[in-house]
Amino acid sequence: MSNVRYISNLTRETYALILAGGRGSRLHELTDWRAKPALYFGGKFRIIDFPLSNCINSGIRRVGVVTQYKSHSLIRHVMRGWGHFKKELGESVEILPASQRYSENWYQGTADAVFQNIDIIRHELPKYVMVLSGDHVYRMDYAGLLAAHAESGADMTVSCLEVPVAEAAGAFGVMEVDDEMRILGFEEKPKHPKHSPGNPEKCLASMGNYVFNTEFLFEQLKKDAQNANSDRDFGKDIIPSIIEKHKVFAYPFKSAFPNEQAYWRDVGTLDSFWQANMELLSPTPALNLYDAKWPIWTYQEQLPPAKFVFDDDDRRGMAVDSIISGGCIISGATVRRSVLFNEVRVCSYSVVEDSVVLPDVVVLRHCKIKNAIIDRGCIIPEGTVIGYNHDHDRAKGFRVSEKGITLVTRDMLGLPVGYE
């Protein structure tokens, strides 16, 4: 009981700041009109729901969501789905858009995004500040990270995980640690990462999740703001500048529950986004969206159930090994190994296989779609074939990824585009 009370005290003394202003340029047209944290995932969620749910499930009830790039749909989603907290009980989820609070510049980097909200953080009087990445899909108990930070007496703690060296190159901050997990070296997105001791194929990568003692954080941010040569970034500037003179520790990422594999996915490319959604179709997926012990919260639209109609030999409404969300109608069509978000219509004689179909898509009759990502609001013309011939897909103006996933957006179909 004392340990539970100790963790509860730590989480009550913490303010979490989720950095959700990134574009996600490697997702190409999929993020032309939305920030990456606003991107859909798993049939009914958005990426931002995962770090927010981690906060709530970890007992952290004071959260700020920092927004910048094309944030309309993100702000709307957070307001609709996360506005039920009671300020009088010390609970809040606040949206913190770039507003030139300390200069005429917008957020210039991850550190600057926190620096420009120092007054808001200070008003909350936290003992600890947790800075979290808002653009990964993962399940993590932040209370364990907080406890490790407090017990080590660290000034800063960086959450980390082992990734393949080839995957980390140019993509992740990479660190060197001693036997006590104190960080001895840190390099942001190196072309040639240093491998982990005894494992030449793996390296220790930063997850972009940090815990700071509040006053220490403020001191470092103010110093960084006065450095004309700084990129205003935690990985490039703050961490390398403090590891020699201050106590900065690494915290190995682990599952929220014993005997379960930890889940973390970088969905920053079309291929990784498609693959992470496809993994959910397994009978026992690594990310269990049905786990009542660690629910993923989101905005719940009032939608009717999914419906499957027609049972003729040549026109049978059916779905196999798929996730079909509320409001969908499969009308005499076949869906296999696919994720359909809310209010998708698949009309007669069409076949959708191995695809991720975002909300409000209409697939008209006699279409064949496989290995595709169909963006929100697309209307697929009758008889369209997608994913069977990449040269034909490119000729139609669709994008084909490195691993052969075809992306279709409204703009590619000549439909009106803009905020969702």
UniProtKB/Swiss-Prot annotation:
Q: Name one GO biological process term.
A: glycogen biosynthetic process
Source species? Shewanella sp. (strain ANA-3)
What Pfam families does the annotation carry? Hexapep_GlmU (PF24894), NTP_transferase (PF00483)
What protein is this chain from? Glucose-1-phosphate adenylyltransferase
Sum up the protein's function in the record's words.
Involved in the biosynthesis of ADP-glucose, a building block required for the elongation reactions to produce glycogen. Catalyzes the reaction between ATP and alpha-D-glucose 1-phosphate (G1P) to produce pyrophosphate and ADP-Glc.
Gene that codes for this? glgC
HAMAP family given in the database record: GlgC
The record's annotation in SUPFAM superfamilies points to: Nucleotide-diphospho-sugar transferases (SSF53448), Trimeric LpxA-like enzymes (SSF51161)
A molecular function annotated in GO for this UniProt entry is:
glucose-1-phosphate adenylyltransferase activity
Query: Which top-level enzyme class is recorded in the Swiss-Prot or TrEMBL entry?
Result: transferase
The entry assigns this protein to a family as follows: Belongs to the bacterial/plant glucose-1-phosphate adenylyltransferase family.
Query: Is ATP-binding included in the keywords of this UniProt record?
Result: yes
Q: Which parts of the sequence bind alpha-D-glucose 1-phosphate?
A: 107, 173, 188-189, 206
